[in-house]
Amino acid sequence: AAPADKPLVYACSGCSNVAQLANQLAVELDRAGRAQMSCISGVGGGVPALVKLAQSGRPILALDGCPLACCQACLAQAGVQADQHVVLSTLAICKRNGRACTHQEQAQAAAAVDAVLHCLTPHGHLA
């Protein structure tokens, strides 16, 4: 499918394990052709081309690591609300700095994101 036919995915990329996992999952969705990843810091920073893409009306999946919901807040700055929003720390994955998520936590988060993405597109399976 052409990029315009895919949902947009935005992810937190903060310093905690769950933030980095959110970014990793978004990259995997993009590389697998399941969604088009775009730059949330550009949206939050008001970069015109990136704000325009966020406001294009395409389905949006926002992946945040923790309840601070920085990804969701950046979208709100552009007047956009995600169609689906996942906060990884609500999946019983403890937020930690200086350590990566375990393989089990990664698999758990990938399964949750896959289920949510499937609501946006029938091709939403995370590889």
Predicted regions mapped to residue ranges:
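Iron-sulfur-associated redox domains of electron-transfer enzymes in respiratory
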Residues: A1-A127
